[in-house]
Amino acid sequence: MLKKYNEWKESLPGVLATILDWVEVFVIAAAIALFMNNVIIANSQVPTGSMETTIEVGDRVIGSRLAYTFGEPKRGDVAIFKFGWKCSVCRYAMGEAPAPEICPYCGQKITHPQTVYYVKRVIGLPGDVIEIKADGSCAQTDIVSEARESVMLFGTEASKPLVTAAVYVNGEKLAEDYLREPMLYTGDMKFEVPAGSYFLMGDNRNNSLDARFWNNHYIAKEKMIAKVLFRYWPGIKAVK
């Protein structure tokens, strides 16, 4: 079949043969790009500041799909994952459950629900017990931004005077040198990560709507899309 195609192409006038050559190049390039984006890499733009300063608003990042196809997510990974659905009318994001017919936020019929992808850091692995507790340190205004001194963190009031909190994994305090600022204490929390699932949080801990506040706190393995490797716009920067 390929031989017949080449013979047919050689019989075409020069201009048509040249055009066909270019068409072949574009088709092959598109096929390679499609394969790369669906099998090997994941390309994502970060719309919020929940991962600052590791990843800034508007950054574009590249992740490796192969990392989670042939391996397991590791604690500390910055991951791209499928969170759920977004209303096609008001763009309200819903969790992992199938998109409802009516948006619970705007009350409009959802005709074309959009898949929502988030970027967060893996904190809890299957079987882990994650606890968030006060660590006994007072949050200083030169460390915690003044705008958060009287903040309501997603409906949970921060302690007054402000006290910082820490994450404990299976009873041991987690070292988190990637945090933008100390996490404010909003009350004790405890999560037991089920088998085949993961617990993820944002690095900008005081401004991140993450697993602490989702109705379903855990992301199933099949929802984990890729491990973020680097930012490619604006400028190239490794993401750790």
What kind of region is each of these model predictions?
Residues 48:
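A short acidic/basic microdomain associated with nuclease active sites
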Residues 2-20, 35, 39, 44-45, ...:
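Soluble "head" domains of membrane/secretory-pathway proteins
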